[in-house]
Amino acid sequence: MKRKVLVLGAGIQGCCIALELANRGFKVDLIEQDSVPFNRSSIRNEGKIHLGLVYINDTGFETPKLMLKAALRFAPYLSRWIGIGVKDLNVGTPFYYLVSNQSFLDTEQLEQRYHQLEKLYCESTEKESFTYLGYKPDKLVQKSSEENLAKHFNTDCLQGGFYTSELAIDTSKLAEHIRKAVKKHSNITFLGNHRILGISKNGSGYIVEGEKNRSNWKKKSLQVVNATWTDKFKLDETLGISTPKEILHRLKYRVIADIPEEMKNFPSATMVIGKFGDVVIRPDKTAYLSWYPDACRGWSNSIEPPESWNEPSRGIVPKKDFDEISEKLIRETEKWYPAIRNCTPKIVDAGIIVAHGKTDVDNKKSRLHQRSKIGVTSYGGYHSVETGKLTTAPMFAMDTADRAEKIYRQL
């Protein structure tokens, strides 16, 4: 069948691609190793829809440009597939960007670069009608006074800070809506618990092979999309596609906690630039928090992450690890955000981050400060997607669908 596509991986990227292809009339088999869609790294993160602020150390400015472009398209594209407003995604309060005393860019340097991003934002919104999560902020960033910062943060840790328009969504809410959309679409067949082992060329098409419940399975199609995130490079290699240098997988833990009523309108915050952390305050009186030095507990330059990372990335964490990790992350976070001491942890889990680099984020020259060489690469009817960030997934889904349409017209 010409209008049939196999989409491998049912995280946010694979689901968005499947939904867009299905809307265009393609029949899609959405193949996933887990029992349900959207149950691994896509859900186990802070949900930030990046405006480019955290990647401001990219001296070529390519990453901030890409993130801003993707952020302005995130909600409009998502609404094509799940048909809801942003308010249904439990959006957190706007972020303060707090400049640590240990930041390798000082407040003045950051202000100059944020001004450059602000200019780019103004140019973008003049040319296009896209909004940021349903809003059209007058400004992305404003420098904050020390008096204002001191209302919520320990300014002894800081050299300055900025109030921003950046927001985070609740990934668990997004997962609920994505799963419903996938389940009800008549053009999508979800194949869960299907481990994918390899891909091979088959005439003008492809064969995807794998395992389910100790039995082998095989699927054929003229077009295949690799949106597997952690297995992307391994599967690319089975087709003879060379693996890029300096692949890096990191395992980063997070805590979701209950907060008291009086905190529900407190600001969200990101500390920059280096090995620091984030807090997201949500309207349902929960908070996301992470502190990188204690949260990043896995580092691998192998082509795929270690098998031992599988359970925490599915939300399975032993009680002793739950207690130890939550205690550490809360203790370290309350040093700069004192009210966090009043929270009660309810979830501890981890997401796998796929990037490129040898050195960590506290190195000014680390490749981790760049995330622009990502997106879709096509080899005939095989489309391999390096998502990069949650923010960019809907935009790359549209690109992938456009490529699939083009290939279909050539068949």
Model regions and ranges:
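C-terminal catalytic lobe of FAD-dependent flavoproteins
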Residues: 159-165, 331-411
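Helical element adjacent to the flavin cofactor pocket in flavoenzyme catalytic cores
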Residues: 160-223, 227-236, 393-401
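Glycine-rich FAD pyrophosphate-binding loop
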Residues: 23-43
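Central helical "cap/lid" subdomain
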Residues: 38, 213-272, 282-285, 304
